[in-house]
Amino acid sequence: MKGSHINHGGVAGNTPIGGEHNHDTIGMLTLDAQGRLAASCTTSGMSYKMHGRVGDSPIIGAGIFVDGEVGAAVCTGVGEIAMRTVASFLVVEKMRGGATAQQACEEAIARMIKITGDPKQVQVGLLALSPGGKVGAFAIQSGFTYALGNSSGNKMHEALHAI
């Protein structure tokens, strides 16, 4: 979202040097040879954030969630929306209800769009993995990329998006 004026929830009136809100989250999902799912999540945080703000990344259910029998999900973007919808948990629960990893991500993003008011002002991306190795990825806007790695190698992908 380089050069955009998307509201990332920072303190009003503060503009980073260069005019960009440089921050992002790295979410990792893995499925081992025994079929066990795991996830991890780290974030650089948001520039000019409100003092004491806790983002979604460390909150189980918002930024990261795993149920070994159902699936795993991670979320990046505007943490307030991820927390409000319990995004990663929502994705895994959609999978529990029969949705594919992709369908679950799309349904969770649809719910986020419904509550945001103006989805053009926010970005959230979701990544999900099923115990069978099926991947889902979806975002509100373009620009959400993810990497897949397996014994055949690594490849970058751009997630589908709603707007």
Regions found by a protein language model. Give the residues of each.
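N-terminal nucleophile
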Residues: M1-I163
